[in-house]
Amino acid sequence: YKRQLIRQFNDRYLLDVTKNKKSPIKNIIMNQKYIVGVGNIYASEALFMSGIHPFRLGKDITKRDCIKLVRAIKSVLKKSIKLGGSSINDHTMVSGKMGYFQNKLYVYGREGSKCVKRSCQSPIIRIVIAQRSSFYCSECQR
């Protein structure tokens, strides 16, 4: 069942979901109706990894963008699960232990810090989309 879900979440599916949408891509990928499990932190991280600006409209997302974004979302979710999630504020695992994914974040919560990409070093910017903080690099994400 798990493999079936993973296979069904692919670039064709994401392209179909985003086409003709006038909403920002970040809102689309956080909408649990379309993609389950992508919250605010994971959306910011996946968009950074795929080089997509969070305000970019769904209708402007290309097939190539979808390939990169699907790969990034899967990578972020797998890494987060492996590290026990993100213990920002009060989240803990069932065991009561804190997760460690927040120690590996590229952009989320790093406003003003330099981009992690050596070739860039631009400051990370914080914006608000649908009452949620979003973090991105203005040079790496278009």
Q: How should each PLM-predicted stretch be described?
A:
Residues 13-142:
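Basic, nucleic-acid-binding surfaces and adjacent catalytic neighborhoods in DNA/RNA-processing proteins
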Residues 1-4:
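Conserved small/polar residues in nucleotide/adenosyl-binding loops
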